[in-house]
Amino acid sequence: MNDQVIIFDTTLRDGEQALSASLTVKEKLQIAYALERLGVDVIEAGFPISSPGDFESVQTIAKHIKNSRVCALSRAVAKDIDAAAEALKVADQFRIHTFLATSTIHVQDKLRRSYDDVLEMAVNAVKHARNYTDDVEFSCEDAGRTPIDNLCRMVEAAIDAGASTINIPDTVGYTVPSEFGGIIQTLFNRVPNIDKAIISVHCHDDLGMSVANSIAAVQAGARQIEGTINGIGERAGNCSLEEIAMIIKTRQELLGVSTGIKHEEIHRTSKLVSQLCNMPIQSNKAVVGANAFSHSSGIHQDGMLKNKNTYEIMTPESIGLKNQALNLTSRSGRAAVKSHMDSMGYKEDEYNLDALYADFLKLADRKGQVFDYDLEALMHFSNLREEDDFYKLNYLSVQSGSVMATTSIKMQCGDAEMCEAAVGNGPVDALYQCIYRVTGYEIVLDKFDLTAKGEGEDGLGQADIIANYKGRKYHGTGVSTDIVEASGQALLHVINSIHRADTIAEMKQKKIATV
Protein backbone atom coordinates (compact mmCIF):
# COMPACT_ATOMS: atom_id res chain seq x y z
CA MET A 1 0.00 0.00 0.00
CA ASN A 2 1.18 3.53 -0.81
CA ASP A 3 2.82 5.15 2.24
CA GLN A 4 2.18 8.76 1.10
CA VAL A 5 -0.80 10.47 2.77
CA ILE A 6 -2.47 13.14 0.63
CA ILE A 7 -3.23 16.34 2.56
CA PHE A 8 -6.51 17.94 1.48
CA ASP A 9 -7.08 21.40 2.93
CA THR A 10 -10.61 22.79 3.26
CA THR A 11 -9.82 25.95 5.24
CA LEU A 12 -11.27 28.11 2.46
CA ARG A 13 -14.50 26.09 2.24
CA ASP A 14 -15.39 24.22 5.42
CA GLY A 15 -13.21 26.45 7.59
CA GLU A 16 -14.71 29.67 6.28
CA GLN A 17 -18.19 28.47 7.26
CA ALA A 18 -17.25 29.20 10.89
CA LEU A 19 -16.41 32.86 10.28
CA SER A 20 -18.71 35.71 11.23
CA ALA A 21 -17.67 37.57 8.07
CA SER A 22 -16.61 36.08 4.75
CA LEU A 23 -13.04 36.43 3.55
CA THR A 24 -12.42 38.64 0.54
CA VAL A 25 -11.13 37.16 -2.70
CA LYS A 26 -7.73 38.74 -2.01
CA GLU A 27 -7.60 37.21 1.50
CA LYS A 28 -8.55 33.79 0.17
CA LEU A 29 -5.80 34.00 -2.43
CA GLN A 30 -3.30 34.93 0.30
CA ILE A 31 -4.27 31.82 2.24
CA ALA A 32 -4.16 29.68 -0.92
CA TYR A 33 -0.60 30.85 -1.62
CA ALA A 34 0.35 30.00 1.98
CA LEU A 35 -1.18 26.53 1.62
CA GLU A 36 0.77 26.03 -1.61
CA ARG A 37 4.02 26.99 0.19
CA LEU A 38 3.09 24.60 2.98
CA GLY A 39 2.97 21.73 0.50
CA VAL A 40 -0.74 20.95 0.68
CA ASP A 41 -1.69 18.49 -2.08
CA VAL A 42 -5.29 19.60 -2.65
CA ILE A 43 -6.85 22.99 -1.84
CA GLU A 44 -10.64 23.03 -1.65
CA ALA A 45 -11.18 26.64 -2.66
CA GLY A 46 -14.94 26.94 -2.20
CA PHE A 47 -18.48 26.03 -3.25
CA PRO A 48 -18.99 27.87 -6.59
CA ILE A 49 -22.77 27.45 -6.90
CA SER A 50 -23.35 28.96 -3.45
CA SER A 51 -22.67 32.60 -4.41
CA PRO A 52 -21.03 34.78 -7.08
CA GLY A 53 -18.33 35.63 -4.53
CA ASP A 54 -17.47 31.99 -3.95
CA PHE A 55 -17.41 31.36 -7.70
CA GLU A 56 -14.98 34.26 -8.18
CA SER A 57 -12.78 33.03 -5.32
CA VAL A 58 -12.52 29.52 -6.75
CA GLN A 59 -11.84 30.88 -10.24
CA THR A 60 -9.13 33.27 -8.97
CA ILE A 61 -7.39 30.59 -6.92
CA ALA A 62 -7.63 28.10 -9.79
CA LYS A 63 -5.92 30.64 -12.06
CA HIS A 64 -3.01 31.42 -9.73
CA ILE A 65 -2.19 28.20 -7.86
CA LYS A 66 0.22 25.96 -9.77
CA ASN A 67 1.78 23.47 -7.35
CA SER A 68 -1.35 22.26 -5.52
CA ARG A 69 -4.45 20.75 -7.09
CA VAL A 70 -7.45 23.10 -6.77
CA CYS A 71 -10.79 21.57 -5.85
CA ALA A 72 -14.37 22.86 -5.71
CA LEU A 73 -17.36 21.41 -3.87
CA SER A 74 -20.73 20.62 -5.43
CA ARG A 75 -23.88 18.86 -4.37
CA ALA A 76 -24.83 15.75 -6.36
CA VAL A 77 -26.73 18.01 -8.76
CA ALA A 78 -25.79 18.66 -12.39
CA LYS A 79 -25.97 22.47 -12.17
CA ASP A 80 -23.66 22.45 -9.12
CA ILE A 81 -21.15 20.27 -10.92
CA ASP A 82 -21.33 22.48 -14.01
CA ALA A 83 -20.64 25.58 -11.91
CA ALA A 84 -17.67 23.90 -10.22
CA ALA A 85 -16.23 22.88 -13.58
CA GLU A 86 -16.71 26.37 -15.01
CA ALA A 87 -14.89 27.98 -12.07
CA LEU A 88 -12.07 25.42 -12.17
CA LYS A 89 -11.41 25.20 -15.90
CA VAL A 90 -8.62 27.81 -15.80
CA ALA A 91 -6.59 25.60 -13.42
CA ASP A 92 -3.59 23.55 -14.51
CA GLN A 93 -5.00 20.63 -12.54
CA PHE A 94 -8.31 20.42 -10.71
CA ARG A 95 -10.71 18.16 -8.85
CA ILE A 96 -14.50 18.18 -8.59
CA HIS A 97 -15.77 17.11 -5.18
CA THR A 98 -19.41 16.07 -5.08
CA PHE A 99 -21.28 14.76 -2.05
CA LEU A 100 -24.53 13.19 -0.93
CA ALA A 101 -25.86 12.18 2.48
CA THR A 102 -25.89 8.44 3.21
CA SER A 103 -26.96 8.03 6.85
CA THR A 104 -30.48 6.84 7.61
CA ILE A 105 -31.48 10.05 9.37
CA HIS A 106 -30.27 12.19 6.46
CA VAL A 107 -31.75 9.97 3.74
CA GLN A 108 -35.15 9.71 5.43
CA ASP A 109 -35.55 13.11 7.11
CA LYS A 110 -33.48 15.46 4.91
CA LEU A 111 -33.52 13.96 1.41
CA ARG A 112 -36.80 12.08 1.95
CA ARG A 113 -35.92 9.46 -0.64
CA SER A 114 -35.30 5.74 -0.72
CA TYR A 115 -31.73 4.53 -0.43
CA ASP A 116 -31.87 3.18 -3.98
CA ASP A 117 -32.80 6.66 -5.23
CA VAL A 118 -29.90 8.17 -3.32
CA LEU A 119 -27.56 5.55 -4.77
CA GLU A 120 -28.69 6.45 -8.29
CA MET A 121 -28.22 10.18 -7.61
CA ALA A 122 -24.66 9.55 -6.44
CA VAL A 123 -23.80 7.46 -9.51
CA ASN A 124 -25.24 10.07 -11.87
CA ALA A 125 -23.35 12.87 -10.14
CA VAL A 126 -20.01 11.08 -10.37
CA LYS A 127 -20.59 10.23 -14.04
CA HIS A 128 -21.51 13.84 -14.80
CA ALA A 129 -18.38 15.14 -13.06
CA ARG A 130 -16.26 12.68 -15.06
CA ASN A 131 -17.29 14.56 -18.21
CA TYR A 132 -15.03 17.38 -16.98
CA THR A 133 -12.14 15.59 -15.26
CA ASP A 134 -10.77 12.19 -14.29
CA ASP A 135 -10.16 13.52 -10.77
CA VAL A 136 -13.55 13.18 -9.08
CA GLU A 137 -14.05 12.85 -5.34
CA PHE A 138 -17.29 11.55 -3.88
CA SER A 139 -18.21 12.06 -0.22
CA CYS A 140 -20.68 9.96 1.75
CA GLU A 141 -22.01 12.68 4.06
CA ASP A 142 -22.51 11.46 7.65
CA ALA A 143 -20.73 8.20 6.85
CA GLY A 144 -19.94 7.78 10.54
CA ARG A 145 -23.64 7.11 11.23
CA THR A 146 -24.40 5.22 8.01
CA PRO A 147 -25.28 1.50 8.30
CA ILE A 148 -22.18 -0.35 7.12
CA ASP A 149 -24.00 -2.40 4.47
CA ASN A 150 -25.38 0.77 2.88
CA LEU A 151 -22.00 2.47 3.08
CA CYS A 152 -20.29 -0.44 1.32
CA ARG A 153 -22.91 -0.36 -1.47
CA MET A 154 -22.50 3.38 -1.93
CA VAL A 155 -18.70 3.25 -2.04
CA GLU A 156 -18.68 0.40 -4.56
CA ALA A 157 -21.22 2.15 -6.81
CA ALA A 158 -19.36 5.49 -6.72
CA ILE A 159 -16.07 3.82 -7.66
CA ASP A 160 -17.75 1.93 -10.50
CA ALA A 161 -19.15 5.26 -11.73
CA GLY A 162 -15.63 6.70 -11.93
CA ALA A 163 -14.81 8.31 -8.57
CA SER A 164 -11.04 8.34 -8.04
CA THR A 165 -11.29 9.38 -4.38
CA ILE A 166 -13.92 8.22 -1.90
CA ASN A 167 -14.28 10.41 1.17
CA ILE A 168 -15.65 8.98 4.43
CA PRO A 169 -16.69 11.92 6.64
CA ASP A 170 -17.51 11.77 10.33
CA THR A 171 -19.70 14.79 9.66
CA VAL A 172 -20.96 15.33 13.21
CA GLY A 173 -17.87 14.10 15.06
CA TYR A 174 -19.77 11.14 16.51
CA THR A 175 -17.36 8.21 16.30
CA VAL A 176 -14.38 7.22 18.45
CA PRO A 177 -11.03 6.10 16.95
CA SER A 178 -11.49 2.34 17.30
CA GLU A 179 -14.95 2.61 15.76
CA PHE A 180 -13.93 4.90 12.91
CA GLY A 181 -10.84 2.87 12.10
CA GLY A 182 -13.10 -0.19 12.05
CA ILE A 183 -15.36 1.43 9.45
CA ILE A 184 -12.38 2.06 7.15
CA GLN A 185 -11.08 -1.47 7.68
CA THR A 186 -14.51 -2.93 6.84
CA LEU A 187 -14.61 -0.98 3.58
CA PHE A 188 -11.23 -2.41 2.59
CA ASN A 189 -12.41 -5.91 3.48
CA ARG A 190 -15.83 -5.81 1.83
CA VAL A 191 -15.77 -3.44 -1.17
CA PRO A 192 -14.41 -5.45 -4.12
CA ASN A 193 -13.19 -2.48 -6.19
CA ILE A 194 -11.71 -0.51 -3.27
CA ASP A 195 -8.22 -0.70 -4.80
CA LYS A 196 -9.35 1.54 -7.69
CA ALA A 197 -9.80 4.62 -5.48
CA ILE A 198 -8.01 6.49 -2.71
CA ILE A 199 -9.90 6.38 0.58
CA SER A 200 -10.12 9.77 2.26
CA VAL A 201 -11.45 10.86 5.66
CA HIS A 202 -12.99 14.14 6.80
CA CYS A 203 -13.49 14.26 10.58
CA HIS A 204 -15.18 16.89 12.72
CA ASP A 205 -14.28 17.69 16.31
CA ASP A 206 -17.62 17.72 18.15
CA LEU A 207 -16.30 15.21 20.71
CA GLY A 208 -12.65 16.22 20.34
CA MET A 209 -11.85 13.11 18.29
CA SER A 210 -11.16 14.49 14.79
CA VAL A 211 -7.38 14.14 14.77
CA ALA A 212 -7.38 10.79 16.57
CA ASN A 213 -10.07 9.43 14.23
CA SER A 214 -8.08 10.56 11.19
CA ILE A 215 -4.93 8.82 12.42
CA ALA A 216 -6.93 5.65 13.17
CA ALA A 217 -8.23 5.78 9.59
CA VAL A 218 -4.69 6.05 8.20
CA GLN A 219 -3.69 3.00 10.24
CA ALA A 220 -6.63 1.17 8.65
CA GLY A 221 -5.57 2.14 5.12
CA ALA A 222 -6.92 5.63 4.35
CA ARG A 223 -4.47 7.68 2.30
CA GLN A 224 -6.04 11.13 2.25
CA ILE A 225 -6.84 13.31 5.26
CA GLU A 226 -9.06 16.37 4.99
CA GLY A 227 -8.91 19.20 7.49
CA THR A 228 -8.21 22.86 8.10
CA ILE A 229 -5.43 25.06 9.42
CA ASN A 230 -5.88 25.60 13.18
CA GLY A 231 -8.84 23.19 13.03
CA ILE A 232 -11.30 25.99 12.20
CA GLY A 233 -14.74 25.01 10.96
CA GLU A 234 -18.40 24.69 11.79
CA ARG A 235 -19.45 23.99 15.38
CA ALA A 236 -16.38 22.57 17.18
CA GLY A 237 -14.28 22.67 14.03
CA ASN A 238 -12.43 20.25 11.78
CA CYS A 239 -9.41 18.03 11.96
CA SER A 240 -6.36 20.23 12.53
CA LEU A 241 -3.96 19.71 9.62
CA GLU A 242 -0.89 21.04 11.43
CA GLU A 243 -1.46 18.45 14.16
CA ILE A 244 -1.87 15.69 11.56
CA ALA A 245 1.35 16.73 9.80
CA MET A 246 3.38 16.75 13.03
CA ILE A 247 1.90 13.46 14.28
CA ILE A 248 2.88 11.73 11.04
CA LYS A 249 6.36 13.30 11.16
CA THR A 250 6.97 12.68 14.87
CA ARG A 251 5.57 9.12 14.93
CA GLN A 252 6.68 8.01 11.46
CA GLU A 253 8.27 4.84 12.81
CA LEU A 254 4.89 3.80 14.23
CA LEU A 255 2.62 4.91 11.39
CA GLY A 256 4.88 4.07 8.45
CA VAL A 257 3.53 6.92 6.31
CA SER A 258 4.64 10.42 5.30
CA THR A 259 3.25 13.64 3.79
CA GLY A 260 4.57 16.28 1.42
CA ILE A 261 4.11 19.03 4.00
CA LYS A 262 6.95 21.52 4.46
CA HIS A 263 6.80 21.55 8.24
CA GLU A 264 8.86 24.71 8.66
CA GLU A 265 5.96 26.64 7.06
CA ILE A 266 3.42 25.50 9.68
CA HIS A 267 3.78 28.39 12.14
CA ARG A 268 3.73 31.03 9.42
CA THR A 269 0.62 29.54 7.80
CA SER A 270 -1.19 29.11 11.11
CA LYS A 271 -0.53 32.73 12.09
CA LEU A 272 -1.74 34.04 8.71
CA VAL A 273 -5.00 32.07 8.89
CA SER A 274 -5.58 33.22 12.47
CA GLN A 275 -5.06 36.88 11.53
CA LEU A 276 -7.11 36.91 8.32
CA CYS A 277 -9.96 34.88 9.84
CA ASN A 278 -9.89 36.89 13.08
CA MET A 279 -9.81 33.66 15.07
CA PRO A 280 -7.21 33.70 17.89
CA ILE A 281 -5.33 30.48 18.50
CA GLN A 282 -5.87 28.90 21.90
CA SER A 283 -2.65 29.29 23.91
CA ASN A 284 -2.47 25.60 24.81
CA LYS A 285 -3.37 24.34 21.32
CA ALA A 286 -1.13 21.51 20.15
CA VAL A 287 1.73 22.43 17.79
CA VAL A 288 0.87 26.12 17.16
CA GLY A 289 -0.41 27.44 20.51
CA ALA A 290 1.68 30.12 22.25
CA ASN A 291 2.44 27.67 25.07
CA ALA A 292 3.15 24.64 22.86
CA PHE A 293 6.90 24.90 23.48
CA SER A 294 6.83 26.77 26.82
CA HIS A 295 8.23 25.25 29.99
CA SER A 296 7.63 26.98 33.32
CA SER A 297 8.00 24.19 35.89
CA GLY A 298 11.39 24.23 37.59
CA ILE A 299 11.75 20.45 37.22
CA HIS A 300 10.91 20.62 33.51
CA GLN A 301 13.27 23.55 32.94
CA ASP A 302 16.11 21.74 34.68
CA GLY A 303 15.53 18.74 32.41
CA MET A 304 15.36 20.94 29.31
CA LEU A 305 18.68 22.60 30.17
CA LYS A 306 20.33 19.20 30.49
CA ASN A 307 18.69 17.58 27.45
CA LYS A 308 15.82 19.11 25.46
CA ASN A 309 14.50 15.66 24.58
CA THR A 310 13.45 15.18 28.21
CA TYR A 311 10.35 17.32 27.64
CA GLU A 312 10.23 18.13 23.90
CA ILE A 313 9.11 15.51 21.39
CA MET A 314 9.43 18.04 18.54
CA THR A 315 11.33 21.29 18.27
CA PRO A 316 10.04 24.82 17.72
CA GLU A 317 12.36 25.05 14.71
CA SER A 318 10.59 22.09 13.09
CA ILE A 319 7.45 24.22 12.58
CA GLY A 320 9.32 27.38 11.64
CA LEU A 321 9.69 28.97 15.08
CA LYS A 322 12.92 30.24 16.52
CA ASN A 323 14.16 28.40 19.58
CA GLN A 324 11.92 29.31 22.52
CA ALA A 325 13.52 30.47 25.75
CA LEU A 326 12.37 29.01 29.04
CA ASN A 327 9.56 31.08 30.57
CA LEU A 328 10.55 32.54 33.91
CA THR A 329 7.78 32.27 36.51
CA SER A 330 7.59 31.71 40.26
CA ARG A 331 7.91 27.97 39.50
CA SER A 332 11.29 28.39 37.80
CA GLY A 333 14.44 27.24 39.52
CA ARG A 334 17.91 28.76 39.89
CA ALA A 335 19.14 26.86 36.82
CA ALA A 336 16.63 28.62 34.57
CA VAL A 337 17.52 32.06 35.99
CA LYS A 338 21.23 31.34 35.51
CA SER A 339 20.56 30.16 31.93
CA HIS A 340 18.87 33.47 31.10
CA MET A 341 21.73 35.45 32.66
CA ASP A 342 24.23 33.38 30.64
CA SER A 343 22.28 34.09 27.43
CA MET A 344 22.57 37.83 28.14
CA GLY A 345 26.35 37.50 28.52
CA TYR A 346 26.67 37.92 32.30
CA LYS A 347 29.39 35.95 34.07
CA GLU A 348 28.80 34.25 37.42
CA ASP A 349 31.18 36.60 39.26
CA GLU A 350 29.15 39.65 38.14
CA TYR A 351 26.16 38.87 40.34
CA ASN A 352 25.09 36.84 43.38
CA LEU A 353 22.80 34.08 42.09
CA ASP A 354 21.18 33.41 45.48
CA ALA A 355 20.34 37.09 46.04
CA LEU A 356 19.15 37.52 42.45
CA TYR A 357 16.98 34.42 42.70
CA ALA A 358 15.38 35.64 45.94
CA ASP A 359 14.52 39.00 44.33
CA PHE A 360 13.33 37.18 41.19
CA LEU A 361 10.84 35.09 43.20
CA LYS A 362 9.38 38.21 44.83
CA LEU A 363 8.94 39.87 41.43
CA ALA A 364 7.53 36.71 39.83
CA ASP A 365 4.93 36.38 42.59
CA ARG A 366 3.76 39.93 41.81
CA LYS A 367 3.79 40.03 38.02
CA GLY A 368 3.66 36.39 36.86
CA GLN A 369 6.11 36.10 33.98
CA VAL A 370 9.54 37.70 34.30
CA PHE A 371 11.56 38.73 31.24
CA ASP A 372 15.27 39.15 30.58
CA TYR A 373 15.13 42.93 31.00
CA ASP A 374 13.46 42.40 34.41
CA LEU A 375 16.31 40.11 35.49
CA GLU A 376 18.85 42.66 34.34
CA ALA A 377 17.07 45.38 36.30
CA LEU A 378 16.93 43.17 39.40
CA MET A 379 20.65 42.57 39.14
CA HIS A 380 21.36 46.31 39.20
CA PHE A 381 18.50 47.69 41.29
CA SER A 382 17.67 44.71 43.53
CA ASN A 383 14.04 44.59 44.74
CA LEU A 384 11.93 46.22 42.01
CA ARG A 385 8.65 47.81 43.11
CA GLU A 386 5.95 49.61 41.13
CA GLU A 387 6.28 52.62 43.42
CA ASP A 388 9.89 52.96 42.21
CA ASP A 389 8.81 53.44 38.57
CA PHE A 390 10.22 56.63 37.07
CA TYR A 391 7.06 57.40 35.07
CA LYS A 392 3.60 57.34 36.68
CA LEU A 393 0.17 58.49 35.49
CA ASN A 394 -1.31 60.86 38.08
CA TYR A 395 -4.32 62.22 36.18
CA LEU A 396 -6.25 61.33 33.03
CA SER A 397 -9.10 63.12 31.25
CA VAL A 398 -10.68 62.01 27.98
CA GLN A 399 -13.07 63.81 25.64
CA SER A 400 -14.33 61.75 22.69
CA GLY A 401 -16.15 63.01 19.63
CA SER A 402 -17.57 61.19 16.65
CA VAL A 403 -14.27 61.43 14.77
CA MET A 404 -11.37 62.40 17.07
CA ALA A 405 -10.60 62.23 20.79
CA THR A 406 -8.71 64.59 23.09
CA THR A 407 -6.76 63.35 26.10
CA SER A 408 -5.17 65.40 28.89
CA ILE A 409 -2.75 63.90 31.42
CA LYS A 410 -0.54 64.73 34.38
CA MET A 411 2.49 62.49 34.76
CA GLN A 412 5.09 62.04 37.46
CA CYS A 413 8.56 61.91 35.90
CA GLY A 414 10.93 61.24 38.78
CA ASP A 415 10.60 64.28 41.03
CA ALA A 416 8.85 66.45 38.42
CA GLU A 417 5.21 66.54 37.35
CA MET A 418 4.41 67.26 33.71
CA CYS A 419 1.15 68.01 31.87
CA GLU A 420 0.31 67.22 28.27
CA ALA A 421 -2.67 67.06 25.91
CA ALA A 422 -3.08 65.46 22.50
CA VAL A 423 -5.64 64.69 19.84
CA GLY A 424 -5.80 61.21 18.38
CA ASN A 425 -7.78 58.68 16.40
CA GLY A 426 -9.60 57.49 19.51
CA PRO A 427 -8.87 57.97 23.23
CA VAL A 428 -6.12 55.34 23.47
CA ASP A 429 -4.24 56.79 20.51
CA ALA A 430 -4.53 60.29 22.02
CA LEU A 431 -3.28 59.02 25.40
CA TYR A 432 -0.32 57.29 23.79
CA GLN A 433 0.60 60.49 21.93
CA CYS A 434 0.62 62.31 25.29
CA ILE A 435 2.84 59.69 26.91
CA TYR A 436 5.26 59.68 23.97
CA ARG A 437 5.60 63.47 24.18
CA VAL A 438 6.22 63.50 27.94
CA THR A 439 8.69 60.59 28.02
CA GLY A 440 10.45 61.19 24.72
CA TYR A 441 10.05 57.50 23.89
CA GLU A 442 8.22 56.45 20.76
CA ILE A 443 7.95 52.70 20.42
CA VAL A 444 6.56 50.27 17.86
CA LEU A 445 3.60 48.21 19.07
CA ASP A 446 3.74 44.61 17.82
CA LYS A 447 0.63 43.53 19.70
CA PHE A 448 -2.22 45.22 21.55
CA ASP A 449 -4.95 43.16 23.25
CA LEU A 450 -7.90 44.18 25.43
CA THR A 451 -9.72 41.54 27.46
CA ALA A 452 -12.52 41.67 30.03
CA LYS A 453 -11.84 40.49 33.58
CA GLY A 454 -15.19 39.81 35.21
CA GLU A 455 -18.69 40.85 34.16
CA GLY A 456 -20.94 43.88 34.53
CA GLU A 457 -20.29 47.61 34.56
CA ASP A 458 -17.70 47.34 37.33
CA GLY A 459 -15.75 44.59 35.56
CA LEU A 460 -12.06 45.14 34.96
CA GLY A 461 -10.43 45.54 31.57
CA GLN A 462 -6.90 44.26 30.97
CA ALA A 463 -4.59 45.69 28.32
CA ASP A 464 -1.62 43.62 27.16
CA ILE A 465 0.96 44.97 24.74
CA ILE A 466 4.18 43.76 23.18
CA ALA A 467 6.40 46.60 22.01
CA ASN A 468 9.63 46.83 20.07
CA TYR A 469 12.30 49.34 21.03
CA LYS A 470 15.78 49.29 19.50
CA GLY A 471 15.36 45.67 18.45
CA ARG A 472 14.28 44.39 21.86
CA LYS A 473 10.78 43.25 22.76
CA TYR A 474 9.08 44.51 25.92
CA HIS A 475 5.83 43.31 27.52
CA GLY A 476 3.36 45.53 29.34
CA THR A 477 0.12 44.91 31.22
CA GLY A 478 -2.43 47.28 32.73
CA VAL A 479 -5.67 46.57 34.61
CA SER A 480 -8.45 49.07 35.40
CA THR A 481 -12.21 49.54 35.29
CA ASP A 482 -11.37 52.14 32.59
CA ILE A 483 -9.90 50.50 29.47
CA VAL A 484 -8.18 53.75 28.44
CA GLU A 485 -6.41 53.92 31.80
CA ALA A 486 -5.53 50.21 31.54
CA SER A 487 -4.02 50.88 28.11
CA GLY A 488 -1.96 53.74 29.54
CA GLN A 489 -0.71 51.56 32.40
CA ALA A 490 0.39 48.90 29.92
CA LEU A 491 2.38 51.43 27.88
CA LEU A 492 3.97 52.93 31.00
CA HIS A 493 4.86 49.42 32.14
CA VAL A 494 6.83 49.05 28.90
CA ILE A 495 8.37 52.53 29.03
CA ASN A 496 9.53 52.09 32.64
CA SER A 497 11.20 48.82 31.62
CA ILE A 498 12.90 50.61 28.71
CA HIS A 499 13.97 53.46 31.02
CA ARG A 500 15.57 50.97 33.43
CA ALA A 501 17.31 49.22 30.51
CA ASP A 502 18.65 52.57 29.26
CA THR A 503 19.86 53.44 32.78
CA ILE A 504 21.66 50.09 33.01
CA ALA A 505 23.26 50.67 29.60
CA GLU A 506 24.53 54.08 30.79
CA MET A 507 25.92 52.50 33.98
CA LYS A 508 27.75 49.89 31.91
CA GLN A 509 29.17 52.57 29.63
CA LYS A 510 30.45 54.60 32.59
CA LYS A 511 32.00 51.47 34.08
CA ILE A 512 33.82 50.77 30.82
CA ALA A 513 34.98 54.39 30.59
CA THR A 514 36.54 54.28 34.07
CA VAL A 515 38.43 51.03 33.46
Swiss-Prot record:
Q: Name the predominant localization.
A: cytoplasm
Extract the Gene3D superfamilies matched here. 1.10.238.260, 3.30.160.270, Aldolase class I
A single GO cellular-component term on record = cytosol
| GO terms, molecular function | 2-isopropylmalate synthase activity; acetyl-CoA C-acetyltransferase activity; manganese ion binding
Pathway annotation:
Amino-acid biosynthesis; L-leucine biosynthesis; L-leucine from 3-methyl-2-oxobutanoate: step 1/4
Keywords assigned by UniProt, alphabetized: Amino-acid biosynthesis, Branched-chain amino acid biosynthesis, Cytoplasm, Leucine biosynthesis, Manganese, Metal-binding, Transferase
Q: What Pfam families does this protein map onto?
A: HCS_D2, HMGL-like, LeuA_dimer
Reactions that this protein is recorded to catalyse: 3-methyl-2-oxobutanoate + acetyl-CoA + H2O = (2S)-2-isopropylmalate + CoA + H(+)
Q: Which family does it belong to?
A: Belongs to the alpha-IPM synthase/homocitrate synthase family. LeuA type 1 subfamily.
Quote the protein name from its UniProt record. 2-isopropylmalate synthase
Q: Gene name?
A: leuA
